Structures are given as C-alpha cells and as structure tokens.
Amino acid sequence: MTSRAAEAAPYYSDEHRPAVLRGRQVDFWLLGSVLGLLGLGIVMVFDASYFLGAERYNDAYALIRRQATFICMAGVLAFFLSRVDPALLKKVAYPALLGGLFLLVLVLIPGIGQIRGGARRWISLGLFAFEPSELMKPLFVLYLARSLSGKQDRMRSFAFGVLPHLVMMLVPILLLLLEPDFGASAVITMVTLAMLFAGGARFTHLAMLGLAVVPPAAALIWHSPYRLERVTAFLDPWRDPLGNGFQLVQSFLAFGSGGVLGTGLGNGKQKLFYLPEGHTDFIFALIGEELGLLGCLAVLICFGVLAMRGFRVATRSRDCFTSLLAFGLTFLFVGQALLNIGVAIGLLPTKGMPLPLVSYGGSSMMSAGLVVGILLALSREART
C-alpha cells in the first residue's frame, strides 16, 4: 500500500473481514458531531422557513415537515450503510458510478429534467424533486477509491496513473456543465485532485493541473453573464447593494447584527424575506445573526470533530481502498461545508451550495446520509 492516506496502516485481505460488521462499535465522536449538526439544522430550518412556508404554501410548518421526512430517510439510509461490509462497497463502485452518470444524462432530457432558476438539475419524484449532482459527488469518490487503490504502482506516472482519472473526471463534469452546475463541477475537481494526491500522485503533476484548470474556468465565467455577475458581486457587493450584491450584503448585515451572542433564537430579521435562500445556502448567516459568534463556532467545532474523526478513520483503515474512501468522503463533506461558509462570509463567490446536515434540502440530506453511513461503516472496521 503506497497511498499517502493509508501509508501507516497494515494490509488485511478482504476475506478476513465479516460480511456484516455487527460486532464493532461505530465512532461515537463522529456520530455525535453528525447528530449535533442535525439538531442545530432542524432548529434553524424551522426558524428560517416558518414565514416562508406560511407565505408560499399557506402552511408555516410545510418546509420543516418535509425536512423532517428527509432526515428520517437519510437516517435509515445511513443506518443500513453503516452495517455494510466495505468489501461490498468496493464491488459496487463501478456500477454505482454508471448509475450516477445515467441519472446525469436523464436530467438533461426535456420532460424529465426540471428547470429551476435557469438550470436543468432536478428530476421530479412526486412529492419532491431529486438533484442527481448531489448523488454524483459521493459516488465519484467511491469510484476514485476503488480505481486508485488498484493502480498504486502507477500513480507516480502522469500518463498511466493520473491522466486516466482526469479523463474519467471530465465525463461527469461535462454533464454537470450542461445543466449547468458549476459548483458541483468545482467540488468534483477539488476532490479528485485531493484524492489523487492522497493516492500517491506527484505534487508537481497536480500543481500543474491546478494551474491548467484556471484558464478554462475563467473562460466559463467570462462567457456566462450570470456567473460573471456573481464574481463581480463577490468582489464588490456594495457597488450594487440592491441588485447583484443584495444577497451578500444581507448576509453581512446578519453577521453584524448577531455579534458575539446573537439576537436570540427566533429574533432575527433576515428571515423576514430579506436574505434570499436563508433556509438553504445562507443558513450559516442566520445562525450568525440569531446565535452569534458562539453559534458559528459551535458549527465549526462540529465540522472540525467530524473532519478529525473521518481522517482518523482513513489513517487507521486496514487496506488502501477503505483508507482512500474515508479520506475522500471526509474531504468532500468538510470541503463543501467550508465552501458554503466561505460564501456566507464573503470569502468566495456564491455557488448555490448547501451546508451539509444543516441546510434545508432532500437531495443534499440523502447525499449526507450516504456519506455518514459509509464513514460509520469504515469506522467499525478501522484499527482502534
């Protein structure tokens, strides 16, 4: 085993592991951080969506009921995945990726994919709509873990180790850009580079790749008025505080109003139709307003604990595949959280990305359930 994510862990063959890991306990620190984020998320989604539900659905409890349903579904998914033998995950990695790519193609078909906000990203499932890009992220991590673990002797070579994975990465990215979904494309690119490095690729190769990504990314932004407006609003939101910069300005006002202790739960003003997407992409700003700096620190601590325990699982895993899988899923989960928080505090352009386990949303919650369930399964079989 030569991957950086697992270089300290000894190898144990798959046949020595049971089909279902019933005798091992999950990582309770990992589980506790997840439950803490879920609990805070339920409270804040209810608070943020109360008036929105009353105005949009004539039912103040409409959105929180749906969120509770999403959490229950994600919890069931996480429970069953936490009992799965990682060897089975390795077997289904490639078929699962093909299934995810099929859904990305399906969403582009008129009449099947739904258009919202100028993007065709959703498939209607009756009571709610499903966003395939949210599922694609963890499935691509699963694929990378399987593929990289089988090519350890070639990872120092660009042509035979790095390039094949980059070519494969372009398939979901091109489908996502057709929706368009620039945020999910950026996340998959970021996670791929991180996992290539963890899998043993040369830093010089990845650094050159990072530089090579800049020109096409800049071209995509420059030739898309919508994305260009987001970037200009990010650079100077106060130039157009009632237009393109409105959302970011309102986010700043939320944090400024909250101070250290916050205005108090339920006492925030931004949820009264001032801050767009306050229950989804900008829920961190509402936490800052009502719970203050202390509430924001609590969120960061929970994600910090999740990151430390997830990476601990990666370094203590018994083989290369599970080590890379734990590393990739942890990096994906925490990376998305940092991107969301970075947008809310004005460090990054707006991307339309939810805060995992906290924001409202069925697709993101199911994706989080998938990630958490697999991490718990990996923690069961990691060395203590």
Listing of model-derived features with the role each one plays in the protein:
Residues 259-294, 317, 321:
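Long extracytoplasmic/lumenal interhelical loops at the membrane interface
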Residues 30-47, 53-247, 285-343, 370-374:
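Hydrophobic alpha-helical transmembrane segments of multi-pass inner membrane proteins, especially
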Residues 1-20, 338-384:
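A juxtamembrane structural motif centered on a specific transmembrane helix
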Residues 123, 155, 162, 260-261, ...:
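Short clusters of hydrophobic/aromatic residues that line enzyme substrate/ligand-binding pockets
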Residues 126-136, 178-180, 259-264, 283, ...:
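Glycine/serine-rich anion-binding loops at beta->alpha junctions
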Residues 19-34:
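N-terminal membrane topogenic signal
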